[in-house]
Amino acid sequence: MFKEQNDKEREYFNQDFTPVNELLKRIRISLVSGVKLNIDDLDFTGIVEFERSQTLVYLTLFQSGRKSIRYGSKRATFAETLNRDIEMLRKNKQFSDFFANDENKCRIMLEFVIDRKKISPKELNSERFDNGRFEIGINGLELRKDGISYYYMPTDAITLSHMGLRAVLQTLVKRTPIGKMTNKISERLEILSQSPDYEYYLFRSRAFVTYKDKCIPLYRGNVRYTEFDYDTLYNQIINSVDWCLDNMYDDGRFLYYYDCCDDTYKDHEHPNRPVDNLYYNDLRHCGGIIALLRAYQLTADEKYITAVKKALDWSVSVSKPHDTQWGTAYFAYYNNKGKLGGTGVLLVAMMQYYLITGDDSYMEYIKGYTRHVMSRVYENGELLGYYIHPAFQDGQPLINMNDEERKATFSFYYPGEALLGLGLYANNFDDELAKEASRVGEKALDWIIEERPKIYSDLFTALPSDAWLMQAIEEWTKDEHFRKENYINFVFTDANTMMEKTYKHDDSPYIDYDGGYYYEYGDHYYPDGARSEGLVAALYLARFLGRKELAEKLLNACKNVAMCQFHLYNSEESSYSHKNPERSARSIRFKATRQWVRVDSIQHVSCFFARLFMAENSFPKKND
């Protein structure tokens, strides 16, 4: 369906962009000197299709610590248009704040409109493949009234950290006269929707940004990755985990959240938390520990172990004891909650630390967390989501729960996290606790595979999402007793569905969709490291069981989704619009256009990448 247009798009990016590089160098000279730009000797055939008084051309200046400045215009020729942009940028009051003469400090972006077409307001959508589809980062939108146009450029999705059409309309309507009528966003959008005076135009653009002495062609405002390779994979693992390490606090916590667009640490889910008491999450903290351990496996660099110990000590500091039938248990208690997943992932992290280093100094807590997980398996095998929750039973331990309370506190993901920790303990020790862990673990696995789909069917989605359970089953099947057909089928069925619901090279609506997941074909793509941890677990399981053909299929799928996720990495080249690119570089974002980073956005991608790398490459590690 999309092969022809994608082949054409890829062919465009395979061109030699030397003329654009030279153009941007000359633009820089003209910005500095004020001398008129001359481009008569440059051949832009196949690169720029300039239409007289139709092709809008923007020039934007970016510099660390400065708000970008830009100007766009349309003139009779490409050269006249660029000279107008240069003239107006030089007149900007903030222009003197930019070191336009320094290619290492001030980056210049050239963006020009292509494929402009008029649509009706009713056609505008972000779901359907039709004349009015708006694709964030690919399409721009123009509102025109009384001969005046207001533009949202495709690259605005990156520079403004937007994700959907509503954010586009909110931004655009504010620039129109409607923006002065009311400060309420909903009222502005309502006025726009009822106004017959505005014409709507969809368009795409071509964009190039300087990087030192080079120019980089952008797609969806981002640097393009066109093929999978292990060097890129490895470098993104180490660099992103180093970013987590470099941004750790003295008490062992990680920097939880970073907004690259605004250079702030306040996360979108907790915007009202004071700056001196920002939200933190103990479960995702443990994911950061696992990422550090993966980096240590790949490098044998002791700096990661030093950081792991600090992070584990913080987790111990928020752990509380309680009694169980197997002895003293410990659970992670933070934000007034005792989450099954919080203790489960902590157990995973501590077990991984023990297995990789052989250091048994946390053994009291490993056993304590194991006992806690076992104590949260209900008599029918259901894993209870919370031990303490402030909204239930006055925040007291949830020992006796009725059916309504169990359902209200059930988590789709916590059981898989807890079962992975339990499996790691059961498979690596031979004491009575390990035997009990196996017994309880089997009961819980039977329930989650057979009963959860019946009781909690509403929690299942078209695109499988329980990667933790896939990893847990991979671990449990190392014990021959647990190689049950229904367990194994769960992993491979979900993995096959994930592979089916992945955009491929020739069926991708946009060329960077290749390797991205979707719920329904046509969805905006999901470059998802968390799900991919389940996919790579299926690869390891297939190899362990000797299913070579399936393993090869899974390996290729992992490579494909990894290449897609390469685009989430904030490289020096791609961080051009960030307020503080020195700080954001080496981190990994949530989404393609949103510029939010969280410790788990790094952890999931880096851990998926690490396991994929280790599946095919030799690496230094302490223990098998």
Positions of predicted regions on the chain:
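Domain-length accessory/inserted modules outside core catalytic folds
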Residues: 303, 322-335, 347, 351-362, ...
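Solvent-exposed loop and edge beta-strand segments that line ligand/cofactor-binding
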Residues: 229, 267-286, 325-346, 359, ...
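CBM-like carbohydrate-recognition segments
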Residues: 280, 500-624
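Extended, well-ordered alpha-helical scaffold segments
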Residues: 23, 226-244, 300-318, 358-376, ...
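Low-complexity, Ser/Thr/Pro/Gly-enriched N-terminal "stalk/linker" regions
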Residues: 214-283, 302, 307-310, 318-326, ...
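Well-ordered alpha-helical scaffold segments within catalytic/enzyme domains
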Residues: 221-230, 286-302, 345-360, 417-433, ...
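Basic nucleic-acid-binding interfaces
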Residues: 2-212
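Solenoidal tandem-repeat scaffolds enriched in leucines and small polar residues
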Residues: 369-449
